[in-house]
Amino acid sequence: MSNINEKDLSEFLESNLRSLNDIDDAVATSSAECNYEDYEEFTNSVDLTFFEQDLSGVLKELKKLAESVVISGKKCDIRNIFEESDVATMKFNLFVWYFLENGQRSDSSEEDVDKGVSAASSYIAMCSLPGAISDLYQIGLYNQCLKIIRNCCHTVRIGETVVTKKSSGAKKKKAGGKSDETNVDGEMTVTTGAADPIIGPPRIAVDSAERYLHHLTTQLFAFLHSNTFSIDTPTLMSTLEVVEDIGRLDLDNRTAGRAIRANSVHEFRSLERFTDRYCAFVHSLVESKYKTRAEVAYGRLIRPRLALMPYPDESNKSSKISTERKRSGELHVNLILSRISRNPEARELKYIQTVTVMVYSQCPDLAEFRTNIATFIHKILEALPYTYTYDFVQFMNVLFKGRGAGVKSLSTELSSILISSFDFTAPDPGAIPNLDAEQNEEEDEEEEGEDEEEEEENEQDDVAVKEEEQSDKSDEENDGDNEENVSKKKEEKKKEKKAKEVKEVGRMDAMSVLYNIVYMACLDKAAAMRLHGANSLTKILQSQSHREAFQLFCATINAEMDEKFGAVGDNLSESLEDLNVSGKAPSSKTKKPTDLLLDEQQIIQKFNKLKLMNKGETRVEKDIVYMIVRRLSTDDKAPVKKAACSLLKSYLSYCDEASKFEVVLSILQMLCRDRMVSVRKTGADAFTELMLRDAILFKESLSSKWLHTLISMLNDTDNDVTEHARKLIMKVLTPLLENSSDLTWTLLDTIESVTNHRQYLMSTLKDAVREKLVKRTVMDSMKQHIISGSEKLDGAWMVFSQLCVQFEQNVDFAIETFSRVDLSRESNLVQYMIHVIENNIKKIDDDTKSDLVNTLQGTFRDYCLHPSHSRSIYHCLGKLMDGIGDRSLHGKEFSDFGETLLIKCFDTIVQSFEMFKDKDEWKRNSESQERLLCTALNVASEVFSYSPQLVPRHERLGKTLSLIVNSTENGSSDASTVNPDMPSVHHTRPPTQLSEVPSSQKSSKGGMMSHEGAMFSDKVRAVGVVTLANMILAHDRLLKLMPMLVKQLQYNTAHQIRSNIVLAIGDICSSYKTDRYAPMLAASLCDPSVIVRRHAINQIARLISFGIFRFNGEIMIRMMLASLDANEDVRNDAKLYISEVLQSEEPNFFPLNFVQYMIALTQARRLVGVGHDEDDRGQVDVAIGGGDPLARPSRIAIYTFMIDSLDDRSRFDVKMSICQRIFTPIVNGEYDFSDYNVQCLLDDALLIMASNEMQVKMDVGKNPNENAMDDPSPEVLEAATGFMQKVYLDHYMKTIVPSILSLREFLNQHRSPLQRKCLLAIRMICIEHKNDIDEILQDNRQLKDEMMFELQRVKQRTEEANRILDEYLKRVAEFKKQQKRLSKSPAPMELDAEPVQESAEAVEMGSPARRIEEDQENVEEEVEMRTPQKKNPDADVPRTPLNALRSTTEEKSTPNARLLSPKTIKKIRRSLGALIHTEMRLNPPNLEETKIDDTTINRSKQADKTEEKTIVEEEPMEEAAAEKTVTAENDHVDAEKTVIAVEIPPATEAEEDEVVDVQSESRRSRRRKTPNYDDEESVDADGKIWKKPKIVNKSPEKEVNISANVTLRRSRRGQSTEPPVVKENSNRKRKSVDEEEENVPTSSSGNTENDPLSRGVTPLIFDESKLGAGRHCSTPIRSREDADPSDVTFSLNLSAITEKEDLKNRSKKVKLITFTISSKRMKRKADQCHCINLPSKFVLFISTVCIIVRLSAVFSLN
């Protein structure tokens, strides 16, 4: 058969193609040399008469014969065939070339394409025969055959091709006036000129293209499968591109799962689908004897498809993966699995592993790619042998550390899959061995040669680069582009060299590698990595074995980190390298100009780290999983929080420690209250799934918190959350209700105990019945439980009543039970029975209804019911009588019955009046009569609610109730003020818009208001308020009684009455749509009672939401002051409304009203007649605390609360507003600059302008979508930051800079101490725009130099602080490492004295003088600075039973384990406090170790639980503590002064006389820094204790010295020029000065104690040290005019004199002298001066002169 086919083929060639020999040999040779590319030259050189004949039959027959030869499988040499046919091979190639060229053009007809396909099939088939490599196979012709195949593939894949013109757009068509035409067959033809060529494949039918492809692919498979000769790499790549196009033709879900292999051409020919043929192509390439084909097949065909890379012709390269690419990836995974199943050689397995690693390392950071690629790799690793899988995990360990976010994310996801699906318990099989030693040696030799060549090339390149640099410098010195190019080349070469250097990484256990990937992902800085880490950790925690192994791994790796870097704390990702121990700035991190302000926080963190390292404390928590869970659940990204919900659920499901369980459960509760809706819903799902699990150890705690959390979500602002919470609640309650247990009744009773929870559950049950989620069996089970008479019946009745209403059943059972209940006792069951009865009236027969009505009427007539039942029972009676509503039938009868009850009520009040007159009788019957009164008033209130028409007929009842409510103990005229902030007719200032209120005082002494003494108890009067309010709501004529109610808010001492009045005012304002009583509700925020303040906040919020009140004026100010309330609930209510409700409705509220708050809090008043009215500026006069400014810390707390919610734009707007509304008016004289309140306002404004909190952070690039994870690139952020800086600078130059410079000139003219703060404000602007200082201060060179010096000084001080900390951190770290090495040594060794001792060098300060002084004191303090040593260290060396049980923590807590003593730590803290710029913050950081006493916390908690909570007077600030921190704590002289300053003699008679003034002042001044319940101390919102310091006299020199620069004071700390503190009792024996100066009379102690003023008079008009102190205590401060200067104590500071001298040595010899002048002598001199009418200032001057004269005499004696 082979010979016949061979012969037939040769005879066919001889008979039909022998004419080809007529072609010139030179043409054939030249065509072969040009690789058959110059077709035009060929056509011009050859006579085409033979080619132009109809040769289609010849070509088809040739294709048939060639194909039959190939399919036969017999080997025949093609050279013999051509020799027998006498046809030249080169000329046959010309024959094929002609038809290939005509069949592949875009304008080729289908006949030409058919001829070209036949020629290509014949040529490829003949090339597959042996001997074709000699002359037949030509690369040019083969590539043209491939092009014909690709054209057919393109036609099949996208359908019949539409012809398009090259580079001819629609605009050109219109401009040329030409259009396309359509022929009769519907085909589009192009009528444009010949100049526009047509591109694309030729137009043929799809069926024809598929038929052609079947022939062409069969011949191509035969060519590749024959392996007769190798193909060069470019041709092979072209072949693979064609094969890849074949694999895309009919790819679908069915074909993607198959990987068919063909063993022969005959089998390949039987494959119908192109996808199956593609798989056969891949198998053939991989199994080829030429290794290059297998390598290229894996690299070019398989790897891109596994990596889901786009195809070359795909224009859409977006992040979304097409369906075709996903199916292709699945197909190639099946191909690899098929190859692995055939037990391939090690070389092919190595190829598969390499491809897998490449796909893994090139994964982009996109979720869709990551998920699919992880699935592909997992399937491949499952099929690979264990050795290759283990080795791949080692690759993950190497690549995870240095790759991008995509590889890290894929590693995290892949790790979770491998952990759960693989068993790596087997030992490490080792690295995969080399495949061929000889080949490796050859490759090594080749690589060495290549390395040598590369080194030579690199040397040549370096020489060339140097020559280029020299030429650039000589020829083009100013050419910056060439320099950039040279630097780029260097950087590229450095990167290449670094890439070649591969660091060896040791092999680890596979599970440890996977655990480490998850562990590091949870702690990663990128939010996307933390998200993947959380998801992976969730899967780990679900398995007990993996959970324990992961916990063990975390403990091990942390121990290694501690050993390497030192135990730093609980921050898992920090080391000493992060601490920058060397003191040099890291090169990788570039600082922004504004990063100077962030160094302060870093210094504080370093100092805290130093203290922890020095103490040697072990980690607070060893449960690393617990720490990671807490960290991820408090993340700032919403997707991470949602992933953390599942993580919390997994952790709580196995947690067995109660404390950790409670903490994690509280975090889950916080997630259910998150501001993101999706987070709240996810948290609720996790909470509910936990609740449905049975294996929870702390089920009771879980149930309670789940109940409160989910029911609270029923009141969510988002409807989706509410609906979701309702479904989750029923998901838990439905099985519990159907199968009742103790947990069921406990949950129901817990819900029933809270009113809001009860209402939410009732509505939820109603919806559940409507949706058929609850069955009737639940109602029956509740009924059986009620009949059984168990203890827990409230919850059962709650569910039973609602189900009875919904199913309309069991009304008879409810009536029967109701008839047996004692209504005179309080019971929650009554309301549920009434609920069933009133909603099922149609089910009640007439007789039963009549009997029930009579029973209820008799109950009301006799008042035989508890007051709590009056509302529900009266409403039920109205329903039974059909007397409620406009369409009621018996409304008249119901109204008449109500009037009867009102008459009965009035008679009861009269009876009580008569009984009240007889004190004995009232004492006996007061309890029963008041209970009767409360019931009668409650019933009357319900009557007025349902029958408002009865109010005008019973107006006397309202007046009587007003008389009862307004009665006081001692008469209204003498009553003490409970709330002095309540507005009244006695205005202390002109009336404002909202403060004009009706008069609340009686107009005459007679009438009803003349009754003396409180009538009845507070409870009766509180109920009377409710009844009176209902009457006012029903009848507007009774509004005249409102002033009396308002007056009770001011004078009534019963908080129940005031609380009901607040609620009544809110209802009246809501009903009558009036804001007349807005000031009263605002003033109620200052009420002593907590319940009154909370009701006031709720009523104000409700009325503002209704649009009746506006959030401005007094409401705006007092609501903000409520955020500083002493009670936590009041604070939370106020902050919740301001931050959540108000800011959501008005986002720009704080920026618009920031200055208004400042003016109101400081009580600064503009001068009258300055040209602008305050109302024009939006300012409202609100008097707070009698016109005194609020305490400074309280003001700062409010400013900080507002600033925290501001963004960059809002901060800048606030700064502009401060300049326009504060700085400019003060400079223009619109404010009285000498006024103390104005000084406070200006001080606050400058502090805010100079504070770090108000810095424009340049926060750009934030994604408004909070679910987004990807952040913008650094380049984009840098460009945006630069642009915004220019914009802000432009506005700074226009508004802020001119205003603040004019203010500086104004302060300089007045020589104000605020000049320093003004410079700080200017310095903040210069820090924000560090590179634009020349432009900002271009007109003031001196100020510019000052600012440059300030910035340099801040930088130097920060560097000094960092240097000090870095040095000590390094020393402590080395000491700890040495201790660990010694502890691990086998023999006990004594520690050397040198490392244990501290260095004698003291901590360097910011002042050179301080350093010199401390160097002198080093020798004296050397012994004190050493660490305490044990008395007998030799006795502690051996381990005894006593010390053998000592824990590691105890050993580390001993003094021997600390390098630095507490005294050294104290010095370091003081040094840092002097160096860091705390003056640039609203809340300066505190380096002191503050600790809150537990007894104080318990006392504050007990105070919160009291029923009546009264706010006491204002407490002082922490100014004294701040001054102690600033002053020299280390000086013994200062310690003595502090002790002396605190000692104050007992109060004199004159001070006792001032108590009355104190009380009167306290009534007027109620607002304070932090309200408290103790007169001696207070606990603020942060839990810090504030003590009342006693008043200490300060001399003017002392106050000036306190306000001086910190560095200056530090430099003079050890000198004798320190100003002394005034000594109250100077009776003690004096030292040398007293002994030498005997002529100076001493003052008597008795006169000093009896003097009414002990504080002295300051000669300064305004002192900065007292600025912003506010009202610290209730003691009235007398003015200088009223002060009696009979006894004045002077403290002279001679440092001002010695500072100006250059003789520094003399300053230490100067001694401080304190002179106390006798009060009698001073008084005598004052009397003499007053006799001649001398002014007091002159008297003071004379006294000062006298003292100076005596001082000179003393110095002369010395």
UniProtKB/Swiss-Prot annotation:
Residues 999-1008 have a biased composition (Low complexity). Its main location: nucleus. One of its GO terms (molecular function) is histone binding. Residues 1326-1385 form a coiled coil. It comes from the Eukaryota. The keyword Ubl conjugation does not apply. GO terms for cellular component: condensed chromosome; condensed chromosome, centromeric region; condensin complex; nucleoplasm. Keywords: Cell cycle, Cell division, Centromere, Chromosome, Coiled coil, DNA condensation, Mitosis, Nucleus. Transmembrane segments: none annotated. It holds the Pfam family Cnd1. Residues 463-473, 485-501, 1424-1437, 1500-1512 have a biased composition (Basic and acidic residues). The keyword Hydrolase does not apply. GO terms for biological process: attachment of mitotic spindle microtubules to kinetochore; cell division; embryo development ending in birth or egg hatching; meiotic chromosome condensation; meiotic chromosome segregation; mitotic chromosome condensation; mitotic sister chromatid segregation. Residues 438-462, 474-484, 1414-1423 have a biased composition (Acidic residues). Residues 969-979, 1602-1618, 1640-1651 have a biased composition (Polar residues). Residues 428-501, 969-1008, 1379-1460, 1500-1656 are annotated as: Disordered. Disulfide bonds: none annotated. It is found in: Nucleus; Chromosome, Centromere. Gene3D superfamilies: Leucine-rich Repeat Variant (1.25.10.10). Disruption phenotype: RNAi-mediated knockdown results in temperature sensitive embryonic lethality with chromosomes displaying segregation defects with increased anaphase bridges and chromosome lagging. Component of the condensin-2 complex. Chromosomal protein which is recruited to mitotic chromosomes by hcp-3 (CENP-A) and hcp-4 (CENP-C). Involved in chromosome segregation during mitosis, playing a role in chromosome condensation and in maintaining chromosome morphology, rigidity and orientation during mitosis. This is Condensin-2 complex subunit hcp-6. The lineage of its organism: Eukaryota, Metazoa, Ecdysozoa, Nematoda, Chromadorea.
